[in-house]
Design a protein with these regions (language model features):
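H-loop (His-switch) and adjacent beta-strand-loop-beta switch element
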Residues: 212-225
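ABC-family P-loop ATPase nucleotide-binding domain
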Residues: 1-11, 222-251
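ABC family nucleotide-binding domain
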Residues: 2-215
Length: 251
């Protein structure tokens, strides 16, 4: 299995003021899946995405990425995993405003120590993939919102990630631009085989994904989602679960 989460919990704070954002979540994601992670604000979906992207750590439980225990990695090792295998797309684009599209896409490759000529070649190829061939010398602050998100996608795929995390990728876009972005993500998944997890609250955008997982109050809500998307419970993946409220899913 590509990704396995076993009885994952996340608690912020201590004592009476502690808040449990995740309450024993178990989930499997197969290689090549395109999963929409849905739920209301405060349901735990963003916390779950941060853990999957190695941007945060679980309080307890086990996270296996390609059979590697992420919980057992130190901070530097998690950073290496994130840098080499995971791509990120954010709602706010997170581009350098006065930097060209090409330079923005090159940035993660620069951090990986790739030579300039090779960086530019990969960045140009990535921009072409998202329909921005010929736009490489435009600064990002001169681009439309849809174009900026395309640059962000090109940057995310430039390092050829195994796993792409998209956090509300259409949140700042109108319907037309949102559909364009979703078609690109769908193409990356179906044609390039990139496994994608997308956080969204929009059911219209979730329809582009192949599977849905709904969160509610720190657990997977098994009463929602498409038939066959959520199977089993936490005992399927973690027999020693001690949290009676734990929910689980299998994609």
């Amino acid at each position: 299995m590509f990704i396995q989460l076993k009885n994952i919990t996340k608690t912020y704070g201590e004592g009476e003021g502690a808040f449990r954002a995740l309450k024993g979540v178990s989930l499997e994601i197969a290689k090549g899946d395109f999963v929409a992670l849905m739920g209301p604000s405060g349901s735990g979906k963003s916390t779950m995405a941060n853990i999957l992207g190695c941007l945060d750590s679980a309080t307890s439980g086990e996270y296996l990425f390609e059979n590697v225990s992420v919980q057992a990695l130190n901070r530097n090792e998690r950073a290496l995993l994130r840098r080499h295998f995971i791509g990120f797309i954010f709602q706010g684009f997170n581009l350098l405003p006065r930097t060209t599209a090409l330079e923005n896409v090159e940035l993660p490759l620069l951090y990986r120590g790739i030579a300039r000529a090779e960086r530019q070649k990969i960045a140009l190829e990535s921009l072409k993939m998202v329909g921005l061939d010929g736009w490489e010398n435009h600064t990002s602050n001169k681009l439309s919102g849809g174009q900026q998100q395309r640059v962000a996608i090109a940057r995310a795929i430039a390092s050829k990630p195994l796993f792409l995390l998209a956090d509300e990728p259409t949140g700042n876009l109108d319907t037309k631009r949102s559909v364009e972005i979703m078609k690109i993500l769908q193409w990356l998944n179906k044609d390039l085989g990139i496994t994608i997890l997308m956080v969204t609250h929009e059911s219209e955008m979730a329809a582009f994904a192949s599977k849905e997982v709904h969160f509610l109050d720190g657990n997977i809500d098994k009463t929602k989602g498409r038939k066959g998307d959520i199977l089993g419970d936490s005992s399927d993946l973690c027999a020693d679960s001690s949290d009676s409220t734990a929910q689980g899913g299998k994609i």
